[in-house]
Amino acid sequence: MSDVAFNGKILNVNLTKNEVEEEIISEEVYRSHLGGYGLGARLLFDRIPAGADPLGPDNVIGFMPGLLTGTPLFGQRFSVVCKSPKNGGWGDANCGGDFGPMLKFTGYDAVLVYGKSEKPVYI
């Protein structure tokens, strides 16, 4: 169990380039968007180009543990966020279970998946 609400970094997985990159996120961004759903909204707004096809490689899918996930306050939730193919706007799902805390325990506050792989791959 962690005693901090954020680790200060996210993982970017680019399937098109077959690359994984760590990105530092400022404390200011965490304070203004509060992790999980809010952080996901900010990161996707900054990264998905206007007019991107929700089912195309320009869309981004984010796995976003909540701000309190993995802390002594027993947060267990995480959000999955993306541009929705249903309405072309914001899409999200809120989930429970062990995935959110386990992601936080790896030292990352989110995983963002970009692009399209030429063949099936494991992340």
Language model features: what each stretch is:
Residues 1-123:
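Acidic carboxylate diad motif detector
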